[in-house]
From Swiss-Prot:
This is 5-oxoprolinase subunit A. It catalyses: 5-oxo-L-proline + ATP + 2 H2O = L-glutamate + ADP + phosphate + H(+). It comes from Acinetobacter baylyi (strain ATCC 33305 / BD413 / ADP1). GO terms for biological process: carbohydrate metabolic process. It is an enzyme of class 3 (hydrolase).
Length: 254
């Protein structure tokens, strides 16, 4: 049994420090690197890419709506052409920096509001999928496990990885509980670690209203910017290894 662990990184902006990239990177197998539209400046992104290359961590483009002020968490109604070119721009920028850092962008994972929107809004999803195909159809799309996006992306000819979240509460339908609601983000490292192990072994989680919700995921997201992120990441990693669950990037075939 194996699982990929990913985290959102490269999100610091100038003197504003976000997350703990240097400490989180050794604990994960994949890194979702900001592309400058919701967070991240070129120097910080480049430093994170170089560390990922040094550690052999797989790199992905964490693309977003153009929303620095809102950290990419505000919904936007962009035209097809706007969203298409915004996503192409971000992927291309990260590909260039990654090449200079000695690594390669292997996948695309949308961020924040864009991630949640295209999970069900297939019109916006089409723009994101087309952006990926225009640049490199071998890029893998990471999306919310159980969402309509997974099948839609496969129908569009893309390789897809279904993702679950370690520290987010789920609704009974498999969607994420809104961050605006109490209990949406989980903070107890031991509870979260046990929950992740059960999610992998039993194929689901207990939703916020107490029902078992099936979730089939190949990657688990660990947020590196929450309170206690380091202790939570360590607890999850240790729990997986203790249970004999191998931590490997989904890009590794064997």
């Amino acid at each position: 049994m194996r699982i990929d662990l990913n985290s959102d990184l490269g999100e610091s902006y100038g003197s504003w420090i976000m997350g703990n990239d240097e400490q989180i990177l050794p604990m994960v197998s994949s890194a979702n690197i900001a592309c400058g539209f919701h967070a991240g400046d070129p120097l910080g992104i480049f430093k994170t890419l170089k560390q990922a290359a040094k550690l052999g961590v797989t790199v992905g483009a964490h693309v977003s709506y153009p929303d620095l002020a809102g950290f990419g968490r505000r919904n936007m109604q962009l035209s097809y052409d706007e969203l298409l070119t915004d996503v192409m721009y971000q992927i291309s920028a990260l590909q260039g920096l990654a090449k200079a850092a000695g690594t390669t962008v292997k996948y695309v994972k949308p961020h924040g509001a864009l991630y949640n929107t295209i999970a069900t809004d297939l019109q916006q999803a089409q723009a994101v999928l087309d952006a990926i195909k225009c640049l490199d159809s071998d890029l893998i799309l990471v999306g919310l496990a159980g969402s309509p996006l997974i099948t839609f992306a496969q129908q569009n000819g893309l390789n897809v990885v279904a993702e679950a979240f370690a520290d987010r509460a789920y609704n009974a339908d498999g969607s994420l509980v809104s961050r605006r609601l109490a209990g949406a983000v989980l903070h107890d490292p031991d509870f979260v670690a046990k929950r992740v192990v059960k999610m992998i072994q039993e194929g689901g989680v207990i939703s916020i209203d107490g029902h078992f919700t099936p979730i089939s995921a190949q990657s688990i997201c660990l947020h590196g910017d929450t309170d206690g992120a380091l202790s939570m990441a360590a607890a999850i990693r240790n729990a997986l290894l203790t249970e004999g669950i191998e931590i490997r990037s989904f890009c590794e075939v064997n």
